[in-house]
């Protein structure tokens, strides 16, 4: 693993000299191996160690290098064709392999190779980008998008039209992370490396980036970049000091209770 990491780190330092025609075989093989590990869930761009999220920068670099090393090519896809550098995850998968994976994929859902989809996950017509990690039992609902290298936990529900930000463009230091058992309401956006901690519930139409104020109405505290464990969050606004206008914010209105959980619980009938 250390040799693989070093090969990718060195190649990234010299990425300006690389092209599909000129890339050394060792670099190409290293990037391919890293992407295969991401695809199988054997490696993650970010992982929790001793309670803290740690970013594996070298894997993010491998994802970026793959765009340098590969030409666009025709990708066959049902009723149409595509022209891209990254093949589709399930393009060469047969029915036995899909059954073994425990994943359900509803047309025309798309996942790029290099994304991991865990057992029991359901992809409604949605999009999962390269380097993303979608853990077991998670529902990615219709028109939801999981950005490059985003980390989605177990038994998460990403409702219709949800956007989870990626790291590739604009280039972000850390991926967006949705921890286990979270519910993200329809048309909400969580981007720029924001962390939504375990069991949180984000209401419909909430937008959270690193500069978004997260206001706790019980304590009056304003925080940024992280939604606390078990918080229930709705869209709101905070007035300017001079009272001339208000600006958007996300508001923590309470902690998840039994009533909230009953409304956002996982429906096992919909799982594979």
From Swiss-Prot:
Its main location: cytoplasm. It catalyses: (S)-2,3,4,5-tetrahydrodipicolinate + succinyl-CoA + H2O = (S)-2-succinylamino-6-oxoheptanedioate + CoA. Its EC number is 2.3.1.117. The keyword Acyltransferase applies. It is an enzyme of class 2 (transferase). InterPro entries: DapD_Trfase_Hexpep_rpt_fam (IPR005664), Hexapep (IPR001451), Hexapep_transf_CS (IPR018357), THP_succinylTrfase_dom1 (IPR023180), THP_succinylTrfase_N_sf (IPR037133), Trimer_LpxA-like_sf (IPR011004). It comes from the Bacteria. Substrate binds at residues 104, 141. Pfam families: Hexapep_2, THDPS_N_2. It is found in: Cytoplasm. One of its GO terms (biological process) is diaminopimelate biosynthetic process. The keyword Cytoplasm applies. Belongs to the transferase hexapeptide repeat family. Homotrimer. This is 2,3,4,5-tetrahydropyridine-2,6-dicarboxylate N-succinyltransferase.
